[in-house]
Swiss-Prot record:
Membrane-crossing segments per the record: 41-61
Highest taxon listed in the record's lineage: Eukaryota
PANTHER family: PHOTOSYSTEM II REACTION CENTER PROTEIN H
Protein name: Photosystem II reaction center protein H
Modified residues (Phosphothreonine): T3, T5
Organism: Glycine max (Soybean)
Lineage: Eukaryota, Viridiplantae, Streptophyta, Embryophyta, Tracheophyta
GO cellular component terms given for this protein: chloroplast thylakoid membrane; photosystem II
InterPro entries linked: PSII_PsbH, PSII_PsbH_sf
UniProt membrane topology term: Single-pass membrane protein
Entry function: One of the components of the core complex of photosystem II (PSII), required for its stability and/or assembly. PSII is a light-driven water:plastoquinone oxidoreductase that uses light energy to abstract electrons from H(2)O, generating O(2) and a proton gradient subsequently used for ATP formation. It consists of a core antenna complex that captures photons, and an electron transfer chain that converts photonic excitation into a charge separation.
Protein keywords: Chloroplast, Membrane, Phosphoprotein, Photosynthesis, Photosystem II, Plastid, Thylakoid, Transmembrane, Transmembrane helix
């Protein structure tokens, strides 16, 4: 047959590199969640400001806001 069996002792594990060793501490907090609300209120404020920004852009695009000194054709 054309199948080949590989023994467990012939396979090598993951290779260790300098970059991997430097980045490992960054991944050590994976899956952990800080208790409480954290930065949720800050994100809510950012989303509200972004929504206001988008509505202003939309009103300017629809020419529903008249800007002094700027002619909209």
């Amino acid at each position: 047959m054309a199948t080949q069996t590989v023994e467990d002792n012939s396979r090598s594990g993951p290779r260790r590199t300098v970059v991997g060793d430097l980045l490992k501490p960054l991944n050590s907090e994976y899956g952990k969640v800080a208790p409480g609300w954290g930065t949720t209120p800050l994100m809510g404020v950012a989303m509200a400001l972004f929504a206001i920004f988008l509505s202003i852009i939309l009103e300017i695009y629809n020419s529903s806001i008249l800007l002094d000194g700027i002619s909209m054709n």
